[in-house]
């Protein structure tokens, strides 16, 4: 049977403000990218989400971002190398402490939002994130955009990389994500997202936003937890994959 990792960005609530339906999503995914307090989340949300993931045997990842909670980490920041190294270490350390207190372990790091997109093309910021991860634990893997430059940059210094695709995002003809600033960048229809996820999982091409067929190689598929249809998307993806004998399972 074919297997594929299904992940979601979770733990992004803050105080009395609630984002998504994390517990229900955790019942369906195999990996949880949990916010570490910089782009979203807080100490209580972080700890509760880690415990909930561990209780469901869901793999735990550090979802690190720019220190920009007001912008939800989706604004580009020009940040010095040493500062980004330190902020990477700081965020991983926070979730590692929560994991240790829960009897769990952090297995990978997935950057968020603008940081994720920047390090896919910017070798300097990518180097800072890679350095921070390696200083904390070189056994942590990096989850990154499939086919982006950071994949080889991280592998060149010994980091394991998990190449990621997105069930709920549109792609360009060259296999890149369509900018969120453009209409149609985010997919909200469960049927469409499930069809795209199945293609990723089975090594088939997807249809770009401009109509071309695009083949994107990956071993993990993401559904954004802040997508209003997140739960419906995940439910449809899981049932569609199962109907085609694809099992949702950890990437490692």
Curated annotation (Swiss-Prot):
The keyword Hydrolase applies. Keywords: ATP-binding, Hydrolase, Nucleotide-binding. It catalyses: 5-oxo-L-proline + ATP + 2 H2O = L-glutamate + ADP + phosphate + H(+). One of its GO terms (biological process) is carbohydrate metabolic process. Its EC number is 3.5.2.9. It comes from the Bacteria. InterPro entries: Glyco_hydro/deAcase_b/a-brl, LamB/YcsF/PxpA-like. Disulfide bonds: none annotated. One of its GO terms (molecular function) is 5-oxoprolinase (ATP-hydrolyzing) activity. Pfam families: LamB_YcsF (PF03746). Catalyzes the cleavage of 5-oxoproline to form L-glutamate coupled to the hydrolysis of ATP to ADP and inorganic phosphate. Belongs to the LamB/PxpA family. Forms a complex composed of PxpA, PxpB and PxpC. This is 5-oxoprolinase subunit A. It comes from Corynebacterium glutamicum (strain ATCC 13032 / DSM 20300 / JCM 1318 / BCRC 11384 / CCUG 27702 / LMG 3730 / NBRC 12168 / NCIMB 10025 / NRRL B-2784 / 534). The gene is pxpA.
